[in-house]
């Protein structure tokens, strides 16, 4: 696997935005780069500033709030954002659900709450993970399949220049089947 390190989300976007058109493989109706891994060194600097991204902070916040409700209903996003974007309208099933909604997947078996409790109880655990994709639910993914499969949380030591532990940091490893550049 190729692993790149970037200062922030914008630097990662800029790299892939410049690389995929030239090095990506024609795959189905897109360009793809497989087996990519990267680290964002400053995850709190997560806003992509490249104008090509056409990033809408209000929409991003609304979508995040929707996930946090745990509701798979596209209508819930509409109530938060003021409208239901076409992409989500197109992905709804017959009940108005977006089955790949991360929030409803996190809430399955209270996964997010369990991860927080695990890390509080034992910061050294390597079992603090959330499964987004559930193979038993594959028939529900008729209209949409989650891009993110799993998220693992690990507390790792932050080592200073002298080799001593300065602090602990929460590391998040995300495993995805697909990640849209746009």
PLM features: residue spans?
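Terminal, non-catalytic protein-protein interaction segments that mediate quaternary/complex assembly
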Residues: 1-182
């Amino acid at each position: 696997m190729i692993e790149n390190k970037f200062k922030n989300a914008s630097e990662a976007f800029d790299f892939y935005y410049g690389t995929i058109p030239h090095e990506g493989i024609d795959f189905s109706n897109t360009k793809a780069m497989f087996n990519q891994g990267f680290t964002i060194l400053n995850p709190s600097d997560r806003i992509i500033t490249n104008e090509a991204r056409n990033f809408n902070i209000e929409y991003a916040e609304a979508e995040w709030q929707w996930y946090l409700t745990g509701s798979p209903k596209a209508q819930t996003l509409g109530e938060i954002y003021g409208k239901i974007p076409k992409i989500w309208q197109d992905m709804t099933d017959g009940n108005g659900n977006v089955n790949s909604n991360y929030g409803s997947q996190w809430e399955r078996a209270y996964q997010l709450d369990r991860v927080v409790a695990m890390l509080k109880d034992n910061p050294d655990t390597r079992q603090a993970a959330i499964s987004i994709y559930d193979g038993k639910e594959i028939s529900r993914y008729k209209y949409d399949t989650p891009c993110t499969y799993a998220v693992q949380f690990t507390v790792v030591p932050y080592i200073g220049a002298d080799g001593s532990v300065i602090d602990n940091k929460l590391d998040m490893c995300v495993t995805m089947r697909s990640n849209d550049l746009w």
